[in-house]
Amino acid sequence: MILIIYAHPYPQHSHANKRMLEQAGTLEGVEIRSLYQLYPDFNIDVAAEQAALARADLVIWQHPMQWYSVPPLLKLWMDKVLAHGWAYGHNGIALRGKPLMWAVTTGGGESHFDIGSFPGFPVLAQPLQATALYCGMKWLPPFAMHCTFICDDETLQAQARHYRQRLIDWQEAHQNG
């Protein structure tokens, strides 16, 4: 099962993430957990989230980039759910070997994330990659959809189909491998 942990504080305003979730949702074996819908009070059900992670074959953290980071509820989710003794530390082996993909949308163009006057995309991924590796997870190449504020619907749909294809490719490789 592919588990998408989706965190967008204003999902009604996100055409890009909406398209991505629509495409992913057409696939069999995909569970989408929308954190802002599940936990509007930020009171996370840690046991339910850990159970979902335990069922997953692939975990995806999907969100818009906000100030070069994750939305606040996703950060809180990480702090609470990725607990010592469960996800890391002594006996913390629940996620060991489980693949994780970061799926992120940005308002800026791809060139905005090249190393230069701004931090490069690999630098921005480091905290998430470090978190995954600390929990014993396997970091997969991220999926990034850039320029989401100015993209026309055709471009958003094409990128969302590309996201769906990444998930299909993973499912096929996982089934055969």
From Swiss-Prot:
Keyword tags: Cell inner membrane, Cell membrane, Flavoprotein, FMN, Membrane, NAD, Oxidoreductase
Entry coiled-coil feature ranges: none
Keyword Cell membrane belongs to the record: yes
Location (main, coarse): membrane
One of the GO BP terms on file: potassium ion transport
Catalysed reaction equations from the record: a quinone + NADH + H(+) = a quinol + NAD(+); a quinone + NADPH + H(+) = a quinol + NADP(+)
Source organism, top-level taxon: Bacteria
Cofactor: FMN
Localization annotation: Cell inner membrane
A GO term, aspect molecular function: NADH:ubiquinone reductase (non-electrogenic) activity
Membrane topology reported for the UniProt record: Peripheral membrane protein
UniProt keyword annotation of Protein biosynthesis present: no
HAMAP family: K_H_efflux_KefF
NCBIfam families found in the cross-reference section: PRK00871.1 (NF002044)
Function description: Regulatory subunit of a potassium efflux system that confers protection against electrophiles. Required for full activity of KefC. Shows redox enzymatic activity, but this enzymatic activity is not required for activation of KefC.
PANTHER family assigned: GLUTATHIONE-REGULATED POTASSIUM-EFFLUX SYSTEM ANCILLARY PROTEIN KEFF, GLUTATHIONE-REGULATED POTASSIUM-EFFLUX SYSTEM ANCILLARY PROTEIN KEFG
Oligomer status and interactors: Homodimer. Interacts with KefC.
Protein name as annotated: Glutathione-regulated potassium-efflux system ancillary protein KefF
Phylogenetic classification of the source organism: Bacteria, Pseudomonadati, Pseudomonadota, Gammaproteobacteria, Enterobacterales
